[in-house]
Amino acid sequence: MTAAMSISLDVNGERVDAQVLPRLNLADFLREHLQLTGTHVGCEHGVCGACTVRMNGEIVRSCLMLAVQTHGASVETIEGLSDGGEIADLQAAFHNRNALQCGFCTPGMLMAAQDLLKQDAEPDRERIRQHLSGNYCRCTGYQAIIDAVETTARARIGRRS
């Protein structure tokens, strides 16, 4: 029998102390232990992007990370970005551009899109495509998603002017 391990981390700005089994992945920890179900589990191989979260400021696939690897880290989920209002404009653009249908990929897409917009305030469509290429959507055909990210980038630039 494998013994549980202690971890301490910040999740969406709140300190979390937990006992976890060494093989528990971060996605399952977030969903099952913390009830943060916006992080979806799709492929469980790190290729679909549905489980994307931000760890120490970088996006990672939570299905490939063990919960014990987050000890001492800062993790942000889609709930943290949504509740804090950081992506309200991006969420509105996804809605207005019909960039979501079933919604399964949406949290990961929003996490990746916000990551891009933090790196590059004015990405062109090719850069948007490239940055989102690790996130799969089987419903929208991607054009509406790219439109939503581009619309958000333009609006944010306009607000700064």
Go through each PLM region and give its residues.
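Signature of N-terminal electron-transfer/Fe-S-associated modules in redox systems
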Residues: M1-S161
